[in-house]
Every structure is written in C-alpha cells, then in structure tokens.
A protein has these predicted regions:
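A short, surface-exposed interaction/processing loop segment used at functional sites
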Residues: 123-150, 250-286, 349-362
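Sec-dependent N-terminal signal peptides of Gram-positive bacterial secreted proteins and lipoproteins
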Residues: 1-24
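Segments that shape or occlude catalytic/ligand-binding pockets
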Residues: 166, 170-334, 339-348
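Preferential activation on post-signal-peptide N-terminal prodomains/segments
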Residues: 18-247
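Intrinsically disordered regions, especially transient/low-confidence alpha-helical propensity segments
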Residues: 10-12, 80, 117, 355
Length: 362
C-alpha cells in the first residue's frame, strides 16, 4: 500500500505562516446518512477507522481535464532577463547536447530551462546563499524539535505584504496559465538567526564544515511558498510523487519557493512545472460519497494495529502521463484526483484516488 508522506515542513509553514487564498464555491448535494458511532468529532467507518465530521460526504462536482504544455524556454529566459534588468550578462553553455543561456548580474545568477520535465526557473544571489541555506537548516532542526527559537512567524523590519507583491510581480512575468495561486508566508527575524547560529556552528564543526560564510549574514528574511491552482484546486505539491524513477509514469508535484530580504528577492526555485493548456470536453464526476466507499474498501483489506483517522478529503490536480490500452505515453494531461489525508499515531500521510476508475494512484 503506497502512501504519500506529507512533509512536515509544509505543514509548519501552513500553520505558523500566513496563507493568502481566494476561496471559491463548489457544487454540493445533501450528505447521505450512515449508521456510525461518533468518537470525538469523528464517525466510525470500520473498526479502528474513523472519518472527521468536518468532511462533507455528500459533496459532488464535475471537473474537466486539461492538456499540458511544457513551456517556452525563450520566453521564460526573456522574462528572467527583464526581471534582472539592465546590465544582465548572457552566457551560452552546452548542456545535454543543446545550447542553454545562463544569466548573471552583479552577484546574482539565474537561468530558465524547459524540457520533458516541464519549466524550471532558478535565481540565486550568491552573497545571500548562506542565509537561504541556514534557513533550510533552521527549519529542519525546528521540525525535529532540536531547537525552539522561532515559530517562523517573527516580526521583521520590512513588510511581508511588500515581499508578497514582489513575488506576485515575478510570477506575472511568466505565462504559466494557472487560474490562481495560494501563497504561504513564513518570516524569521535577524535576532532568531543570531540565536540559532551557535547551534548551527556546533553542527558544522562536528561535520568538519566551515562556518565562516555564515558569519555576519543574519538579517530579516521572508520565505514564500507558492502553490499553483487550476480552478479552485491546487496541483499536487513537491511532497508528492507518483510512478517509478526512470520510467515514463514518474510524476512529481511542484510548488515555488521565494526568499526575500529588505533588499528584494534573493532566491527563486520553480522546479518542473507543467503548464495547463487546452480544456478537454469530457467531464469527470468527483463524488466524496464514492471516495468514502473506496476508502472503506481499501481498509477492509488491512489489519489495523492503530486507529486511523481520515482528516481531510479534497481535490488536487496532477499532470499524469496519458495511458491507453495498457501503454504509457510521454504526453501528459492535468486531471483531478481525490486526495485523502489520514493520521495514524500523530503521523500525517496522504494517498490519492483517481475518479476515472476509482483506483489508488501508484
């Protein structure tokens, strides 16, 4: 039984940071009634299997699939060059048998590329690289309860709203074709970084690494994760993977990461994003009633040692490879999936059901 483990990093940012989202309306029908036992805000589906009362099991909607575009490298490179501004230097390098443009301005390097795995855009201020690196280490250590210095919702000396507008402006330069975005904002103050430094230095010394590059690098930082949406629904994020490595059916999710200081955007990471294009005429009916039936069937075949709680059922889009007559093709299509989040012994996991055949996505 394959499950997608939810990265606690994302969960902490969602809980501790601020989420900016436009909420839409979904078609609903009357929930059906079942004979179950209420247990602390849950109902019992099977022995040791519970479903949250907050889930509308009568929800039903019809959604479309979308063709996929890989993107336009020339357009993406031009947008990146315009963002960097006057004085940007271009260097043509050969990678994977083709020419590729890398951009440099002052201490900032950037590039955009498009391949069979989608559109990639990266930007790094080399002077600020230690700050971004230390943020990642800081977050990881906090998740593992090794430090308790910041909740990643610190008061900083510049406006996170201004940082958010800079990120939105950056994204507007690219023709990504998504309906909307959710933005999750985390902030870490200079003082929190300075309090974390001794712990980081101790760990680096143990690993034989040099702490010198981190000295005097502490400053207020705003980190923004961006989750693209089709209609009202997010696409699968970077914590999700389907298929097998090196196979055509391998599919990774994506979200965008931006790091912003008072001086501006210092780091961008947009990795492997597929662009939705033409809307297909066929409709896909998504029913939470049917999803609950499939969940019940799934766990009927499993001997549960611990209680399992179904916390959330929602719709997410995924750029899955087209399959026909048992064959998998490089062509992809965004299609809606039913994402089921469960909790077992305090650990959150997620698995996906495909409403085209109501099988679990592997």
């Amino acid at each position: 039984m394959k499950r997608v483990v939810i990265c606690i990093c994302t969960l902490i940012m969602v809980c501790a940071g601020c989420t900016y989202s436009n909420q839409g309306q979904e078609q609903k029908s009357e929930p059906y009634s079942v004979s179950t036992t209420a247990v602390d805000g849950y109902q019992e589906l099977l022995s040791k299997l519970y479903i949250s009362d907050s889930i509308d099991r009568g929800f039903v909607t019809k959604l479309r699939q979308y063709d996929v575009s890989f993107g336009d490298e020339a357009q993406a490179t031009q947008a990146l060059k315009e963002w960097l501004g006057e004085g940007t230097q271009e260097t043509v390098v050969s990678e994977d048998g083709r020419d590729h443009v890398k951009l440099t301005k002052d201490q900032t390097t950037a590039e955009a590329s498009v391949n069979k795995n989608g559109t990639w855009v990266t930007l790094t201020n080399q002077n600020k690289r230690p700050l971004v690196t230390s943020y990642s280490a800081f977050l990881a250590d906090s998740i593992e309860n090794k430090v308790a210095i910041s909740k990643f919702n610190d008061t900083i000396k510049f406006s996170s709203e201004v940082a958010l507008e800079k990120v939105k402006k950056f994204i507007e330069g690219y023709q990504l074709n998504f309906s909307d975005y959710d933005f999750v904002v985390a902030t870490v103050s200079k003082e929190s970084f300075e309090a974390y430094w001794p712990y980081l230095k101790e760990n680096l010394v143990k690993e034989g690494a040099d702490f010198t590059s981190f000295e005097d690098q502490a400053e207020d930082l705003c980190v923004i994760s961006v989750f693209p949406k089709i209609g009202e629904h997010r696409i699968i994020d970077s914590n999700t993977r389907f298929g097998s490595p090196e196979q055509l059916n391998i599919t990774y999710g994506t979200n965008f990461m931006f790091a912003v200081t008072e001086s501006g955007v210092i780091h961008v990471d947009i990795t492997g994003v597929f662009l939705p294009s033409n809307i297909r005429s066929e409709e896909v009916e998504v029913s939470y009633d049917k999803a609950v039936e499939m969940i019940r069937n799934k766990y009927q075949e499993t001997l549960l040692e611990n209680p399992v709680y179904i916390e959330k059922i929602q719709i997410e889009y995924a750029p899955l490879p087209v399959q026909q007559d048992g064959q998998v093709y490089e062509e992809r299509r965004y299609q809606p999936l039913v994402a089921v989040t469960v909790k077992e012994e305090g650990r959150f996991e997620k698995f996906y059901l495909n409403p085209l055949n109501w099988k679990e996505v592997q």
